[in-house]
């Protein structure tokens, strides 16, 4: 494949061409030349649009594709198409399948389905066998087979002893240990944020301390073991402060926030719409302000979609009985720009969805430089559009954002010697 991308602004904080408008020539999966103007032969494909921007391929650290076991929610093929539509060239697949991804055979299953695609699928295995929180998986064996991270995701590791052992095991490996801080003994049967809204609606609340207590535990264990950890889906003001304090202390810790937890609050649930039922729940405006400041200050490293397809039968229920979850890949960038452009620079935003996930996961940087592999997302951050049902590629449709006015859109992907216009 040979293609020239004309007059595109490079947004890549790791590149010497950052913020420059250039032509980029891609040949045989590599960036062959970057210059103000490049002359080519008539056989080379040319891609040009108004206000083109280009970055390292976008990377989402939390996707659920359902297969195997939950194909009625999402297949891997569906999920990959949704990721591409949203502008993502890389995803980290969560192990929430049936059976769960807790052994090398399951890793092989995913690798066989996802090979030779334009999207790179990286595998996160469970930390405990069958996500039961009792016994560790065969960590070294799974790493040898390509597993790059371990997490029980929304089930969280409740056992302090198991988490301590896991941190010690993983300490001298290249893999990342991830945990969603949520003490289930505190959450109990809570379904939305504990506060005024939960009281008014008569719904059981999830206190902020359910997150904060476990975060304190994880930080203490990280300090004790001198290992490293990534905390997922942070949602409270105090959690952001705890991450800041831990980083200032020199503890090896990183963190992400789910996109929807940045700008929605618990008042979204006032009409009992289960499309707004997520875990962690939407918190308060003060929490959201702290999250935005945390993103701005670099305390929160990554923005993720937390793409979690749920079948309609499990959403069209009473709020207490409906499943947690929301899809997000297709609408992610438009929501990020429209909600964060006044707070973060475009370079900061792209770092959160591209450079930083790779850095945290230990994946080779694909900086936009001559000679490097071409893994790129082409986009226009100024495109205004309305998210419609036809834009949903996912098999499940559990999103509250249909009809929303968005800003910013992916236009094309370059990866694995393939070029796709979106």
Question: Where are the model-predicted features located?
Answer:
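His/Asp/Glu-enriched, well-ordered alpha-helical/loop segment
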Residues: 200-226, 296-297, 302-303, 308-381
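Histidine/acidic residue-rich metal-binding segments in metalloenzymes
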Residues: 137-303
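Divalent metal-coordination and catalytic microenvironments
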Residues: 8, 24, 29, 51, ...
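Active-site mouth loops of central-metabolism enzymes
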Residues: 61-74, 122-135, 204-208
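Metal-associated gating/positioning segment near the N- to mid-region
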Residues: 52-114
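N-terminal metal-binding scaffold of metallo-dependent hydrolase/deaminase domains
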Residues: 1-40, 418
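Active-site metal-binding motif and surrounding structural segment of the metallo-beta-lactamase
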Residues: 38-54
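C-terminal cap of metal-dependent C-N hydrolases
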Residues: 8, 318-321, 373-422
């Amino acid at each position: 494949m040979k293609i020239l991308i004309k007059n595109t602004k490079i947004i890549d904080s790791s590149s010497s061409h950052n913020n420059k408008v250039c032509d980029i020539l891609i040949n045989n999966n590599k960036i062959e030349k970057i210059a103000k103007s490049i002359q080519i032969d008539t056989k080379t494909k040319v891609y040009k649009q108004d206000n083109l921007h280009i970055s390292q391929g976008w990377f989402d650290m939390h996707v659920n594709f359902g297969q195997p076991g939950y194909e009625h929610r999402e297949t891997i093929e569906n999920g990959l198409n949704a990721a591409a539509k949203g502008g993502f060239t890389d995803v980290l697949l969560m192990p929430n399948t049936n059976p769960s991804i807790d052994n090398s055979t399951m890793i092989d299953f995913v690798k066989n389905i996802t090979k030779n695609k334009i999207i790179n699928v990286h595998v996160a295995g469970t930390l405990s066998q069958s996500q039961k929180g009792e016994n560790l998986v065969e960590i070294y064996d799974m790493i040898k087979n390509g597993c790059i991270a371990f997490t029980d995701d929304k089930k969280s590791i409740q056992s302090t002893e198991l988490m301590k052992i896991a941190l010690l095991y993983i300490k001298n490996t290249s893999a990342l240990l991830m945990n969603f801080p949520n003490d289930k003994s505190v959450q109990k049967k809570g379904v939305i944020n504990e506060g005024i809204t939960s009281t008014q609606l008569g719904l059981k609340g999830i206190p902020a301390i359910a997150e904060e207590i476990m975060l304190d535990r994880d930080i203490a264990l990280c300090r004790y073991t001198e290992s490293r950890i990534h905390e997922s889906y942070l949602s409270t003001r105090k959690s952001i402060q705890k991450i800041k304090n831990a980083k200032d202390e020199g503890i090896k810790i990183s963190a992400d926030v789910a996109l929807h937890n940045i700008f929605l609050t618990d008042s979204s649930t006032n009409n009992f719409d289960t499309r707004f039922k997520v875990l962690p729940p939407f918190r308060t405006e003060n929490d959201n302000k702290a999250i935005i400041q945390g993103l701005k200050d670099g305390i929160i490293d990554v923005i993720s979609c937390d793409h979690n397809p749920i079948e309609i039968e499990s959403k069209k229920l009473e709020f207490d009985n409906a499943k947690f979850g929301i899809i997000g890949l297709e609408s992610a960038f438009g929501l990020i720009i429209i909600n964060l452009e006044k707070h973060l620079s475009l370079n900061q935003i792209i770092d959160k969805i591209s450079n930083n996930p790779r850095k945290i996961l230990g994946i080779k940087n694909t900086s936009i430089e001559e000679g490097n592999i071409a893994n790129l997302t082409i986009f226009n951050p100024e495109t205004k559009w309305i998210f419609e049902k036809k834009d949903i590629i996912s098999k499940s449709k559990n999103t509250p954002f249909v009809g929303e006015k968005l800003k910013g859109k992916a236009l094309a992907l370059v990866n694995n010697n393939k070029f796709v216009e979106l």
